[in-house]
Structure formats: C-alpha cells, structure tokens
From Swiss-Prot:
Keyword Protein transport applies: no
Entry protein name: Small ribosomal subunit protein uS11
The keyword Transferase is assigned to this record: no
Keywords from the UniProt entry: Ribonucleoprotein, Ribosomal protein, RNA-binding, rRNA-binding
Gene Ontology biological process terms in this record: translation
Similarity comment: family membership: Belongs to the universal ribosomal protein uS11 family.
GO CC, one annotated term: ribonucleoprotein complex
Role according to the record: Located on the platform of the 30S subunit.
Database matches in Pfam families: Ribosomal_S11 (PF00411)
Organism: Pyrobaculum arsenaticum (strain DSM 13514 / JCM 11321 / PZ6)
Transmembrane segments: none
Domain of life: Archaea
Complex and partners: Part of the 30S ribosomal subunit.
Name of the gene this protein is made from: rps11
Database matches in InterPro entries: Ribosomal_uS11, Ribosomal_uS11_archaeal, Ribosomal_uS11_CS, Ribosomal_uS11_sf
Amino acid sequence: MSAEQQPQQQQKLRWGIAWIYSSSNNTIITITDLTGAETVARVSGGQVVRADKDKPSPWAAMQAAYKAAQLAMARGINAVHIKVRGPGGYGMKVPGPGASAAIRALARSGLVIGRIEDVTPIPHDIIRPPSGRKGRRV
C-alpha cells in the first residue's frame, strides 16, 4: 500500500465529548455527542467496584473509563474532547484522584483524544460555606 492511498482508507472521525467529574468520593464519566444533548454512555466508579471505599480510587476511574469507551465505540463515537471537572464552589478546586487515570484510560482504549479542558466552576466572589451541625457540643 502506497503512502498516498493510506489516508483515504482511514475512517472518518465521529466526535463526542467525555465529561469527567472527579471528586474525593467518586468519579463519573459521561460521554455525549458534540452538542451535549444526547448521552451516549454514563459510567461511575461505584458501578465497577463493590466496596464504597474504592469508588474514588484511580483503579475504579480507569475501569469506568474503559467501560464508557467501549459503550461509546459501540454507538459509533471514535474520537472525544475531554472536559474535566472538580467539585468547585466551596469544595475542592482541583479534580479528585481518578481524573488523570480516567484520561489515560480513555486514551489507551482506542479513542482519539482532541482537546482536554478543565471546566471546574470557580467562584468569582466569596462563597459562604455551609454552617456546622446544630445542637449542643460537649
């Protein structure tokens, strides 16, 4: 096969968006179409592990990303832009421990990676944290 014929046989990329929400409690991976209106795959770390303490782990995020990638490729999406989100607000401003593992797993699963963007909501003023527990403290 000559070098001129090879790009013509390459398959056409069908893009989607992989939304990775990673907190200190769980990692949720949602793959949508480019408009974001139709959800193609949605997998969380709690779906792939048995113990609750393992939900935020990088291993659970990696398994969830592999599962979401397989579901997306079965629906015809073969390239994704990644949007990573942390809790934001008065919570952590950085994504949890599973975010980087999920990005690596999406890249290894055979999906073409476009842009990687951080979409954590960042306050532009002061956010008052929730008040403590009411009642008598001894």
